[in-house]
Amino acid sequence: ILGGLDTSDFGGVWIRNTSLKDLNKEERTIFRRRNIGFVFQQYNLIPSLSIRENIVLPMRLDGKEIDVDFFNEIVETLGLKDKLERFPSTLSGGQQQRVSIARALLTKPAIVLADEPTGNLDSVTSMEVVGLLKSCAVRFHQTILIVTHQEEVAQMADRVIRMSDGKIYTRDCNDC
């Protein structure tokens, strides 16, 4: 619902002063592409596109110019600079997830939604990816919401909201 993939039965979601409920399906698709970055458990990279092409795809679909300086800063931060001409199948899972993060950040979205971004990664790589998400949040002034079942991942967050059976049962604030 928060990502605009589905609509709510009651209540609402507002992002950048826009009610998602007021948008039709096509408008929500465009709004999502411009305002919400997604990082999924499955990296959702297109195998036939290079790493560079995968990262810039949302901008190309939207007909937007690429901010080259911002692109370079993102790929440098995520350690992808020397991998841009490679293809997804030649990268490790952690590297593919970094590409997914870069793609999510490039459009400068209002929020990045990361759904189990470490689910397919080993514990060391998981902590590395979460650390990168956290440093990107600070460096790029980005709101990142992570959904996880891993307690170690949750403990790295500034705020933790725990849910069970669709209801919030605790709220923790680690650094606020």
Could you say what each language-model-derived stretch is?
Residues 1-156, 160-163:
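ABC family nucleotide-binding domain
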Residues 160-173:
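H-loop (His-switch) and adjacent beta-strand-loop-beta switch element
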